[in-house]
Structures are given as C-alpha cells and as structure tokens.
Regions:
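Conserved mixed alpha/beta catalytic, RNA-binding, or beta-rich assembly cores of soluble enzyme
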Residues: 1-70, 84, 105, 113, ...
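Mid-chain, well-packed structural core segment of small domains
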Residues: 60-92, 96
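A generic membrane alpha-helix/interface feature
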Residues: 92, 99, 122-124
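Alpha-helix-loop-beta-strand connector modules within alpha/beta enzyme cores
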Residues: 98-107
Length: 147
C-alpha cells in the first residue's frame, strides 16, 4: 500500500482558493503521476499540507517540519502539486532538502494532468494576483462596498 502526502502551494490554496480538486481527482483515477503506481497497489492519502510560504531559500526547516508531521503517519511518497511544479522557484531545493532529511520517502514533482501549459498557467496566475482586492482596511474606511 502506498501512503501518499500532497504538498500544495500556499499562495495557490490560501490566496487564490485552489482546493486541490484536480490533484485529488487524478489521485482517485490513478492518472498522470499517480499512474506510476502498480494497479494492484492500494493508494492511500495520508494528508495534504501547504508549503510554509515563499521564500525559504536559505532554510527549508519549516517545510521539513511540515513533512515530518506526515511521516508520523507512515507516508512513503510526497507529491508536489502542479501549482508547486509550475510556480515555485524553490521546488528543486525543497526536493533535495526533503530527500536528504527523509531518505526513505520518495519525492514526486507533479500530481494532475497539465490542462494548461506551465507558461500560460504562470501568466494567468500572475494576472489573478494583480487583481484589486478588498481587505479589512476597506471595511474600516467604509470602502468595502464601492464598485
């Protein structure tokens, strides 16, 4: 039985509302990177965790601690989501650090089928981040209901 953990991009999940629905759909259907597991091997989701956020270029310690939480539940493989694969400039450093810290855990970069080319995906995500957004300050200043 494969016990799989999924590492998501906190910008994608917390700021942009990604629910990991495509990752989980391909997990259930054994598509894309999940098709690499033998058909007769049961796949179990050990959990989904968010990356601690950008940047941790000098020290991936926060990420290592989050992964350690999954190791307590017997995870044997961590999949980086498509969002991490396409958006994260630190993914290779994270992968190397995790492989060093957890030599018995396999790290896979990718989850679901790429419905959009990475370059187009990055362009569209960048556009989402640039949209004006209301905050608590807008409520305090009574500007939250302006068009």
């Amino acid at each position: 039985m494969a016990k799989i953990g999924i590492l998501t991009c906190s910008n994608a999940t917390q700021d942009l509302g990604c629910s990991s629905v495509s990752c989980l759909a391909d997990f259930r259907k054994r598509k894309e990177t999940f098709s690499e597991y033998p058909e007769d091997e049961k796949l179990t989701s050990a959990g989904i965790i968010n990356c601690p956020g950008c940047p941790t270029l000098t020290s991936p310690d926060k990420l290592i601690e989050r992964i350690r939480a999954l190791t307590n539940f017997g995870v044997d493989t961590i999949h980086f989501t498509y969002c991490v694969k396409s958006l994260c400039p630190f993914k290779e450093k994270y992968k190397d650090s995790l492989e060093e810290s957890f030599p018995n855990i396999r790290i896979v970069i990718g989850t679901h089928e790429e419905h959009i080319a990475p370059e187009e995906f990055r362009r569209r995500v960048k556009k989402l981040f640039r949209q004006p957004r209301k905050t608590m300050v807008d409520i305090i200043l009574n500007k939250d209901e302006e068009a």
